[in-house]
């Protein structure tokens, strides 16, 4: 799943029509294993509001000294977002940090929305429709 450094922080924000409970793992030990279990137990369902999830990610980043990390948001999405790109863009500008928002698309993801988000945040879109694990590894290597 993930291979993290001892200083790395991974924050999981599952979402459908809205963001769900935030899960955090620091380092590469038991917390990361627990995060992996949480991911494995997730089941897709409901709507898709990737912008709200990305906004929550920006809010979470405010809790860290970003100069000590290489921050990035990685969205895994299988649908078309029902949320507002403009609301995300406003919050992104307010944060004042250049945090790339990478996307991994699978299922019926809307590539146009993902490309717009990637272009705005200086990131990329990865295609996970064939191999989600490889797409995720590509994102981690890119950041």
Describe each region flagged by the PLM.
Residues 41-48, 55, 79-131, 135-139:
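VWA/integrin I-like adhesion module and closely mimicked acidic/polar interface patches used
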Residues 1-26, 53-54, 72-76, 106-109:
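Von Willebrand factor
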Residues 2, 61-64:
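Hydrophobic pocket-lining residues that define ligand/cofactor binding sites across diverse proteins
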Residues 21-25, 32, 36, 91-96:
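Generic alpha-helical hydrophobic packing signal
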Residues 16-18, 28-45, 52, 63-66:
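Exposed, interaction-prone extracellular/peripheral surfaces
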Residues 5-10, 66-71, 96-102, 121-124:
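Loop/turn elements at helix/coil->beta-strand transitions in domains of secreted/extracellular proteins
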Residues 7-8, 20, 31-37, 50-51, ...:
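Mature, Sec-exported extracytoplasmic domains of Gram-positive
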């Amino acid at each position: 799943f993930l291979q993290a450094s001892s200083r790395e922080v991974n924050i999981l924000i599952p979402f459908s029509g809205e963001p769900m409970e935030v899960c955090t793992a620091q380092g590469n030990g038991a917390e990361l294993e627990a995060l992996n279990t949480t991911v494995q137990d997730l089941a897709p369902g409901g709507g898709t509001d990737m912008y709200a999830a990305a906004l929550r990610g920006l809010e979470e980043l405010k809790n860290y000294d970003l100069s000590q990390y290489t921050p990035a948001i990685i969205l895994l999405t299988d649908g078309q977002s029902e949320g507002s790109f403009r609301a995300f863009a406003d919050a992104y500008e307010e944060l004042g940090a250049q945090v790339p928002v990478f996307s991994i698309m699978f299922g019926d993801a809307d590539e146009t929305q993902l490309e717009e988000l990637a272009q705005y945040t200086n990131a990329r879109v990865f295609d996970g429709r064939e191999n989600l694990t490889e797409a995720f590894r590509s994102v981690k290597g890119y950041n």
